[in-house]
Structures are given as structure tokens and as C-alpha cells.
Amino acid sequence: NFKIIASNYSCKIGEIDVIASKEDTLHFIEIKYRKNLMYGNPLEAVNYRKQQKIYKTAMWFLNENQIFMDFQCSFDVIAITEEQIRYIYNCFGVM
């Protein structure tokens, strides 16, 4: 089970929708919703630039919360459309 550490975490670098822990892994979770695909698939919104921002924000969080420094990190995405909800674990790797 996940334990929510923070929601809508923000710092001067950026924002992360949800930070949660499960066992020895810290999950930095981006949530993207699209009512329809006119503006693209929700996963497409988590492009390389967005991934970099999430990663840098996660490093800021870890620097502020050193208790989690020994945790593994997973950068996850929840992609929501009218038809489905997809949880993609470790959607992108370390920059």
C-alpha cells in the first residue's frame, strides 16, 4: 500500500502532484487528465522538458527531506481519459 507523503508539492523549481512511499521506494507521481484526445494523449504531456522539471523538483524535495535519501525513486504517471485510467510505474528514468 502507498503512503501519501505530499500532494501538490511545490518549490521554486516546480510542482509534483503526489509524492508517496511504498516499502523502500519513493514515487513521484504526475497526474494528467484529458477529457478527449483533441489535445493529445495525457502521456504526451509528460514530455522530456516536463520530465526534467519533475526530476529537479524531486531532487529538491529529497534535499529538504533527507530521511528519504536512501529510498529508491520511481517517476510514475497516472494518465486519465474518459475511457480509462492508466498507472505507469517508473515511466521515465533519471536524467
Task: Annotate each language-model stretch with its function.
Residues 35-60, 64:
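Mg2+/Mn2+-dependent nuclease catalytic core
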Residues 13, 26-28, 72, 85:
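Structural motif
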Residues 64-95:
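Domain-level recognition of nuclease-like catalytic cores that cleave nucleotide substrates
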Residues 11-13, 22-24, 81:
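A generic beta-sheet turn/junction motif
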Residues 1-12:
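A short acidic/basic microdomain associated with nuclease active sites
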Residues 9, 31-33, 90:
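Active-site donor-binding loop signature of nucleotide-sugar glycosyltransferases
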Residues 16-38, 54:
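Conserved catalytic cores of phosphodiester-cleaving nucleases, focusing on short active-site segments
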